Amino acid sequence: MNIENYLNETLKEHKLHFTLIDPDEQTPQEAVEIAKQAKKARSDAILVGGSITDQEDLNITVKSIKEEVDLPVILFPGNISGVSKYADALLFMSLLNSTNPYWITGAQALSAPSIKKMGIETIPMGYLIIEPGGTVGWVGDSKPIPRKKSDLAVAYALAAEFLGMRVIYLEAGSGADSHIPVDFIMKVKKLTNLMVIVGGGIKTAQDALEVKEAGADIIITGTVVEETDDTYKKIKELTDVIH
């Protein structure tokens, strides 16, 4: 199955929710249990990755999920170690507002030959860090876009589109106090033809609804799933408003 086609076809029916699993935060067994509950709660895919990833843990986690859960598993690599041959697809991303060329094209060039050999489907994506940015903003040497400067986000998103990317990910950072401002999402969606992913700071159904109504195509939640006592209930609260 071509994952990008699956996403585009599903978007004709409803907006999407991805459950983010960070192998650094869960054991493979815990990751499988989260993925099972995500499937039951109608999440549309499992996103696997983090800012710091051990490749052995990643391989075990992805393989375990694939063996037990019938959902697409998409990689969200934080570095060249964030690649696994067991995944269905990979968000091949460039951190657009990094000050370090390594995160813009360096890591991508280093990992590309291995990805080619593995035969993993790649989805070209621009990754944009918005304040506060969290761990990924620090690790990625980014200049997080101020929350009142939506025009800067639009400029980067247009650049991503003109460079041939088909997806833009607006990231507030894992565990952010609040989600991406709605005007960022609205303007990027209106002024580009990109698939818009939004993550960071989405903790409640109301948050998810605001982001969806602003124009997000795919909504990512991770921290809120890690911290809840009832994974199924929390994800279902989100998917009920997203779908």
From Swiss-Prot:
Gene3D superfamilies: FMN-linked oxidoreductases. Its cofactor is Mg(2+). Its EC number is 2.5.1.41. It comes from Methanosphaera stadtmanae (strain ATCC 43021 / DSM 3091 / JCM 11832 / MCB-3). It is found in: Cytoplasm. The lineage of its organism: Archaea, Methanobacteriati, Methanobacteriota, Methanomada group, Methanobacteria. It catalyses: sn-glycerol 1-phosphate + (2E,6E,10E)-geranylgeranyl diphosphate = sn-3-O-(geranylgeranyl)glycerol 1-phosphate + diphosphate. It comes from the Archaea. Belongs to the GGGP/HepGP synthase family. Group II subfamily. Sn-glycerol 1-phosphate binds at Y169, L170, E171, A172, G173, S174, G175, G200, G201, G222, T223. Mg(2+) binds at D22, S51. This is Geranylgeranylglyceryl phosphate synthase.
